[in-house]
């Protein structure tokens, strides 16, 4: 009798494992070359408390993973390839196409990559900044261009900014071209659209389209004049036919372009940040960076996480990313030490520019540092930059 019961328990356990197992199939493409398949990319599926599953993409860019766990919103997919930025995305991810971004060399560059599901067939990326509107009908703007345009599901659509200009605002939005005349459509909200933002060799932000919202335009984020991200992440309606150029488009986007607070899990963010500090202390810089970014995903106003992230980036030699993190620290500075924090961050950015030989940019940021706080170090740096003109 006991033997029969034991056999039954083993059978049920085996059935449970099979039932919870899940097969995940994805495709990996280049973010900058249309339809280029990426082979030999390492694809990792992770979930807390479970053993990671790893696969490699084949010549067609396809990768299949058999997960011994249920793949849900608590699961992470990570794609790694030499010469490309790591891609990190929350699941569900089965049947999706992901595009990896080649490492960028510009200190002031940025790449924005859009992917989505099978429907709608055509989503379009739009980048709007003073005097410029980069999209499918106008693929090149000042220091920015549409690298890849996709009209038959999945994406990617990629916009690269070669040089962000301090003092100018940039708005990035996604238009549901397939349902462009249907302001009450739910198709965009149900598209599984995701936006990935890259600086240097790192993915620094990611966004998922809000669910159960009607509209044909997803206004994702704004880069403010200081170069800081302002999360908008709102779905609404817009008539892009009225936008003949970049000067007209803000009028079209006006109902949706006000930055909103993005809710997150503050307690989880603090926990992830502590884990990141521990990893940093052990010298595990890659893991620390991942944890600090995860903390920021949970709380986009977490200043300490950005400060820690900047240190990790600098230690790893990720200079462009260090600039981005310092800009965010400037934006979040508050309290009695705010001026000191801003001055220090401007100085850090200036030193990076000076070391790269970008002396006019360095001078501008040394002057910004001095505008926040008097310091003979800043005075001498300004003299040094003026002598190089």
Language model region names:
Residues 22-42, 115-119:
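Structural motif
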Residues 49-65, 150-151:
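Short, acidic Ser/Thr/Gly-rich low-complexity loop/linker segments typical of extracellular
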Residues 50, 70-92:
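A short, solvent-exposed loop/turn motif at the edges and junctions
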Residues 101-263:
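Intrinsic-disorder/low-complexity signal
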Residues 261-298:
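Alpha-helical segment of the N-proximal tetratricopeptide repeat
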Residues 274, 308, 341, 348, ...:
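Canonical tetratricopeptide repeat
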């Amino acid at each position: 009798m006991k033997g029969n019961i034991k056999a039954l328990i083993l059978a049920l356990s085996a059935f449970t494992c099979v039932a919870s197992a899940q097969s995940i199939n994805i495709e990996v493409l280049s973010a900058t070359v249309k339809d280029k398949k990426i082979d030999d990319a390492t694809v990792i599926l992770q979930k807390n408390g479970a053993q990671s599953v790893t696969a490699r993409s084949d010549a067609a860019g396809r990768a299949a993973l058999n997960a011994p766990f249920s793949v849900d919103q608590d699961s992470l997919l990570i794609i790694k390839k030499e010469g490309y930025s790591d891609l990190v995305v929350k699941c569900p991810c089965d049947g999706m196409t992901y595009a990896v971004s080649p490492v960028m060399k510009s200190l002031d560059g940025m790449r924005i990559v859009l992917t989505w599901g099978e429907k709608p067939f055509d989503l379009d990326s739009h980048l709007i900044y003073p005097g410029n509107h980069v999209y499918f009908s106008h693929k090149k703007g000042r220091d920015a261009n549409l690298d890849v345009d996709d009209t038959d599901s999945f994406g990617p659509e990629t916009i690269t900014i070669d040089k962000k200009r301090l003092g100018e605002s940039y708005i990035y939005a996604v238009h549901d071209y397939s349902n462009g005349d249907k302001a009450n459509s739910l198709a965009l909200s149900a598209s599984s659209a995701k936006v990935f933002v890259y600086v240097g060799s790192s993915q620094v932000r990611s966004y998922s389209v809000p669910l159960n919202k009607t509209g044909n335009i997803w206004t994702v984020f704004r880069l403010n004049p200081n170069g800081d991200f302002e999360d908008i992440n709102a779905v609404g309606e817009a008539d892009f036919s009225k936008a003949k150029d970049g000067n007209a488009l803000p009028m079209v986007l006006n109902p949706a372009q006000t930055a909103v607070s993005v809710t997150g899990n503050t307690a989880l963010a603090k926990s992830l940040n502590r884990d990141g500090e521990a990893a940093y202390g052990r010298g595990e810089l890659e893991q620390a960076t991942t944890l600090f970014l995860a903390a920021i995903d949970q709380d986009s106003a977490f200043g300490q996480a950005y400060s820690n992230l900047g240190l990790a980036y600098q230690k790893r030699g990720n200079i462009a990313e260090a600039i981005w993190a310092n800009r965010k620290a400037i934006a979040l500075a508050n309290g009695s030490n705010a001026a000191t924090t801003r001055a220090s961050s401007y100085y850090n950015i200036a030193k990076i520019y000076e070391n790269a030989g970008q002396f006019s940019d360095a001078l501008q940021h040394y002057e910004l540092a001095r505008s926040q706080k008097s310091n003979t170090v800043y005075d001498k740096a300004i003299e040094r930059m003026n002598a190089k003109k």
